[in-house]
Every structure is written in C-alpha cells, then in structure tokens.
C-alpha cells in the first residue's frame, strides 16, 4: 500500500489550506488516481489496523438497500452513528440509491441487479455504472455521497472497477473505501465467474483534516507490510446473499491502530 502513503505525503507537500463544511479545516489537493492489481493481494492498509468487521458489514448493509443503522448496531458497527437521526435513519443514502433509485413514473431501479445482468450478458458495455449521486434527493440525505459513482470493466476474463470519490478523508475514510470496493469487485467477479482485475480509485477533493496531522506523520513513519489475501468461503445464490462469515482475510499483520477524531 505504498500508493496510499505516497498520497498522504503528496497532500502534505502540495496541499492547499481550505475551509470545509465541518469547520475543521483541511490540506487539500484536487484530482488523484491510484490503481490496485487485486491479483497481487487484498488492498487493506497495513500501516495501521483497519476494522474489517465495519468494512464488511457496511458493504453488506449497502447491498441490502438499508439506510437505518439498526443492522450496523446489531453487528457492533458504529461508523454511521454521528449522522443518524433519533430513529437511526439516514435518509436515501447509498443503499437506497444502489437498490431503489426512484424514477419520475414511480418505479424504482435496482442498479446492482442491473449491472450484474450487464456483466453477464453484455460485458463489453461501456454503461456498466452505479451512481449514488441523486441530485433530486441530496437534500434528504444525512450525508451526501462521498464515493459517488463507479464503473465496471471486463477484459481477458477479469473484472475491474473504477470509483470516483468526490470528497476523500485520506486518513480515516480512504482505507475503508479502498477495501470496501475491492471486496465488492471480488464478490461481483465470483457471481459472474470472472477473475479479479484492477481496482482504480479516482479522487476529487482529496484531503487531510487539520486535526489528523500527528496521526498522518506517525503512519508515514511506519513501513508497509505484505498485503493479505481475501478468501470467500462459498458462492451464494446471489450478490445479496453473502454473510459476514463468508469472508476471511488471511495473512493480515498490520501495525497498531491509530485513533483520530471524525469530522462531522
């Protein structure tokens, strides 16, 4: 994961001081890309421990179309707590847009099922895309989508994916985002009888918060370790039938975790 550390250093070296919605302040760059060959290992940051339980359960929660944090709480995941209302609701965030994008005539589009069908029946299509950026519902969301738009691509029997992330918290959020979409590529590839290819991450406003600087320097002082391997123990009937127990990360030997405040 040297690419991730190189991005951190780039933001420190080249970033512009900016104000932000949270009032915290950031160092920010605009436009950056990283490519991870998923054949070479699972891209889980090793210079600090990442909470894999949260990453897996959040993705399963998205795929169910859920937008209430009850499921996350049942599985000891608290990463969305700060944005939920008193009933645990977040509004029409990722899961709603992925699974039930509303149309003007009252129907709903299941984008995940749509892209799966495209991958199986028209893998050369240039329209195998999922968007969470629904302009008509942004004002109803507790938090506008940060990882907003992703596209799948099939070549030589391998499935690749590119994500556009409009806003990226490099220290806290990005390790989760990389691992989450890498996991999704593995799951989609298994469902479509494909090998995994590359995960390409593209960032817009890519920033380090001003209260993450000490943590960033600590992480940069650590040497990356070998990437772990993802094992999926079974092939469920559909992309929506995976369970937490289906996944195993083999050989994950990270440095200790580093705590940092969340900008809300």
Curated annotation (Swiss-Prot):
Family matches, as InterPro entries: Thymidate_synth/dCMP_Mease, Thymidate_synth/dCMP_Mease_dom, Thymidate_synth/dCMP_Mease_sf, Thymidylate_synthase, Thymidylate_synthase_AS
Catalysed conversion reaction: dUMP + (6R)-5,10-methylene-5,6,7,8-tetrahydrofolate = 7,8-dihydrofolate + dTMP
Chief location category: cytoplasm
Source organism superkingdom: Bacteria
Pathway the protein takes part in: Pyrimidine metabolism; dTTP biosynthesis
Enzyme Commission code: 2.1.1.45
Molecular function terms, GO-annotated: thymidylate synthase activity
Enzyme category, top tier: transferase
Annotated catalytic residues: 146
GO cellular component, one term: cytosol
An annotated GO BP: methylation
Binding positions for (6R)-5,10-methylene-5,6,7,8-tetrahydrofolate per the UniProt entry: 51, 169, 263
Binding site for dUMP: 21, 126-127, 166-169, 177, 207-209
Function: Catalyzes the reductive methylation of 2'-deoxyuridine-5'-monophosphate (dUMP) to 2'-deoxythymidine-5'-monophosphate (dTMP) while utilizing 5,10-methylenetetrahydrofolate (mTHF) as the methyl donor and reductant in the reaction, yielding dihydrofolate (DHF) as a by-product. This enzymatic reaction provides an intracellular de novo source of dTMP, an essential precursor for DNA biosynthesis.
Family: Belongs to the thymidylate synthase family. Bacterial-type ThyA subfamily.
Protein name: Thymidylate synthase
Natural source organism: Escherichia fergusonii (strain ATCC 35469 / DSM 13698 / CCUG 18766 / IAM 14443 / JCM 21226 / LMG 7866 / NBRC 102419 / NCTC 12128 / CDC 0568-73)
Taxonomic lineage of the native organism: Bacteria, Pseudomonadati, Pseudomonadota, Gammaproteobacteria, Enterobacterales
Gene: thyA
């Amino acid at each position: 994961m040297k690419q991730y550390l190189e991005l951190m250093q780039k933001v420190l070296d080249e970033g512009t001081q900016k104000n932000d919605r949270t009032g915290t302040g950031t160092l920010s760059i605009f436009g950056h890309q990283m490519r991870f060959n998923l054949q070479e290992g699972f891209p889980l940051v090793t210079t600090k421990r990442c909470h894999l339980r949260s990453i897996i359960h959040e993705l399963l929660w998205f795929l169910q179309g859920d937008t209430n944090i009850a499921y996350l709480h049942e599985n000891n995941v608290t990463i969305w707590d700060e944005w939920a209302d008193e009933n645990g609701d977040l509004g029409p965030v990722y899961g709603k847009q992925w699974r039930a994008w509303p149309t003007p005539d009252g129907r709903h589009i299941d984008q995940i099922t749509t892209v799966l069908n495209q991958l199986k029946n028209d893998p050369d299509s240039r329209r195998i895309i999922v968007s969470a950026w629904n302009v008509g519902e942004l004002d109803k969301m507790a938090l506008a989508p940060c990882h907003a738009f992703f596209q799948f691509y099939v070549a030589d029997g391998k499935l690749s994916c590119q994500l556009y992330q409009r806003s990226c918290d490099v220290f806290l959020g990005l390790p989760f985002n990389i691992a989450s979409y890498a996991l999704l590529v593995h799951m989609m590839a298994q469902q479509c009888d494909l090998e995994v290819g590359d995960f390409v991450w593209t960032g817009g406003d890519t920033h380090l918060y001003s209260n993450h600087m000490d943590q960033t320097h600590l992480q940069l002082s650590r040497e990356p370790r070998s990437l772990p391997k993802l094992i999926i123990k079974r092939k469920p009937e559909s992309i929506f039938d995976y369970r937490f127990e289906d996944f195993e990360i083999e050989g994950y030997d990270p440095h200790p975790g580093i705590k940092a405040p969340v900008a809300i």
